[in-house]
Amino acid sequence: MDFDYSPKTKDLQDRLQAFMEEHIYPAEGAYHAEIAANTAAGKRWTPLQTIENLKPKAQAAGLWNLFLPVDSAAASGYDGAGLTNQEYAPLAEIMGRVMWSSEVFNCSAPDTGNMETIARYGSESNKARWLKPLLEGKIRSAFAMTEPEVASSDATNIQTRIERQGDDYVINGRKWWTSGAGDPRCAVFITMGKTNPDAPRHSQQSMIIVPAGTAGLTVVRALNVMGYDDAPHGHMEVLFANVRVPAGNILLGEGRGFEIAQGRLGPGRIHHCMRLIGLAERALELMCKRASLRVAFGKPIAAQTVTQERIAEARCKIDMARLLTLKAAWMMDIGGNKFAKNEIAMIKVVAPSMACQVIDWAMQAHGGGGMCDDFPLAYSYVNARTLRFADGPDEVHRNSIAKAELGKYMVKAKPA
């Protein structure tokens, strides 16, 4: 078994790490200062020039749209990096060290998932209208799936209606946690809803493209995540009231929503988990540096046995999560979503919980400082904790893993 990265991946890792050192880490202070200045000026939901100024540099460095896998690149007609999931995974980890950096490389959610969805399932006209400007970074997008009135962890509960009327579809419903909808550059929503309530359970839902600004589409409010609003990106509550779009905006056809979701969410979960591993790596680095410098009870905090135990445990947890995630990425490359289903569920359980624990230990080592925004740890923890819900809660993935495991033995069971 070869655990080494390909020469192509190593080259991109080196170039990406160099870009982070030269441009991203030095810009962290400017990023937060710009948000503070925009907030004071009443312009909190304004695109950040700190990020916009770095995008041309990322493009010039050949570090643009790295997420787009081989099959989606071919479908989109985009001649980019064309990486496999396994090749992209370590790059996502590097970007994850600074939570906003993936946007610099046009590799941030939900745009990545939306671009892959349109590339794979959209018509040629939809690709021309939406995919091209998304790949160029000229517009942003949102993904509307979760609903406030039902337990959306069971996606068959989704109640938003998408009804055919002549040459159009009319959409009615309410969504929340619609990430990306707060950005004024958000030009398009991919929305999941019910087209046929009488169809079999997993054939009732469809996905459809909804241009922002369509009559009846209203962004109701921004939702805070443990006090953070993630402006200017945002997680919004959105109302669809008799929103009418052309029938050609349906993706893949009626009743194919779950099929699309599986194709979309698998790579997205790998991206999220690898970014979390990068976030946890940075938290461990900060923990080690802080513990080595601070003295309590006559010796460095790093000399305390409890601190050493946590550092060792953090290293073990991070490396285990990374290996499992890379395995899931490799399995997806060779066999697709269904082949990697169990491993993807496992990483979605393991990586967020690991990151929460490692970041929590790092916060503890920072004392009171770990709880404030003088350090990135509190915000990092919120991000990691959110991903125990986003793209499916822990409980759903644990149930899936357990069913697969029990299935190995149920066929052999005999009545007593």
Regions found by a protein language model. Give the residues of each.
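A short, Trp-centered hydrophobic/proline-enriched beta-strand micro-motif
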Residues: 137-146
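Flexible, small-/acidic-enriched active-site or ligand-binding loops
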Residues: 157, 215-244
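A short core secondary-structure module
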Residues: 167-168, 172-220
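Cytochrome P450 core scaffold surrounding the K-helix E-X-X-R motif
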Residues: 152, 219, 249-254
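Short, surface-exposed charged micro-motifs
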Residues: 159-161
